[in-house]
Amino acid sequence: MAILLAFGLVAIYSSTVHQSGTSYVTRQAVWIAVGMAAMVGASRIRTKTLEAFAPLIYAVAVLLLAIVLVAGTGPHGAKRWFNLGFMSLQPSELAKIATVLFLARYLSGRKEIGESIRSVLTVFAIVGLPAFLVLYEPDMGTALVIAFIAIPMLYAAGLDPLYLAFLVSPLLAVIAAGEIVAWIIFTAFLIAVMVLAKFRTSLVALIFGVNFLVGSLAPRIWMGLEPYQRERIQAFLNPEAYSHGAGFQTIQAKIAVGSGGLIGKGLLQGTQKALGLVPEQHTDFIFSVIGEEMGFLASAAVLAVLAYVILKLFDVAKQARDRFTTYICFGFASMVLIQTVVNVGMNLGMTPVTGLTLPFLSYGGSSVIMLLGSMGIILSAYSTRKGY
């Protein structure tokens, strides 16, 4: 983690020094120090204590998400942060941790999920409430992270992979709903798989009903997105058509990464960065700064270290002494994995621009403090893996 944090500070300095001097990198260094303190503090909290307070933490996070919609601030009319003067507090970062803790507590109290419709619906409610509030800010990227965290946690809880596939089928329903032939094929395939798998009639009805409802509402869902969100999705599908609009940042980020070559142009020498062609260089597109100025080798090294950290987090989950600890480790590891894949993907034009930051590297006080705090919880889990 120290290597990633150091890389992040260097990239933040390089991407902001010409416009703002050392103010950004100084603030990030302070937030990292606070995050380290949070990590040490969290590592001393027993997981049993976290399990007991998980409902309260979740309730506080949901309450803050509701309040920020009324009293929050943010760019372009969004309401994502509380302005505290010396920093901006982003409740959605706490919501990610709170959702993992509360969902882990719920799953650990169930012997098995199996085909229990009630259990699956409860999981949907646990992740759906904070995800909906975050989406309303609007912050589609973080909302998707909160929602998708449930998938690996349910897998760890023993839910059949086939059932997990059906949990994400509504997303396919939204896509298929745009064309009648695709919708017919999707519906027929969905029903055929459920019949061949010998699902209970009630479960077949539930899955079909949810997909039919979501598919029917697809036009409303699309129009319910903010204009810039629709443009980002359209730009992802056809970036050249939006080269002077929503697709501009993706195209410029790809150019920056590709122009770095093997060893990069050198620190502070990035032309795409210096000309301001890549927006949000110190947050969403910090990977493009690393690619342009430090090259492929440094980019590959960053990804390798991130992969190592993620694998170690999953390894801690396997060594955990109880189910609750296993689930929280799976949840936090998945959180880092999802954000890494999406952020790097949007820097390479492989995923839509969602505003998700790159874990450990991007600028952001709330994100780095909460992230390091979650790592402290995993350290607590690791220290008690043998029951002491």
Give the residues covered by each predicted segment:
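A juxtamembrane structural motif centered on a specific transmembrane helix
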Residues: 343-388
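Pore-lining and gate-forming transmembrane alpha-helices of multi-pass membrane transport proteins
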Residues: 288, 299, 330-331, 359, ...
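Short capping/connector residues at structural and topological boundaries
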Residues: 17, 87-89, 94, 267-268, ...
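Transmembrane helix boundary and interhelical junction motifs in multipass membrane proteins
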Residues: 139-144, 265-270, 281-283, 348, ...
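TM-adjacent membrane-interface loops and short helices in multi-pass inner/ER membrane proteins
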Residues: 235-283, 294-298
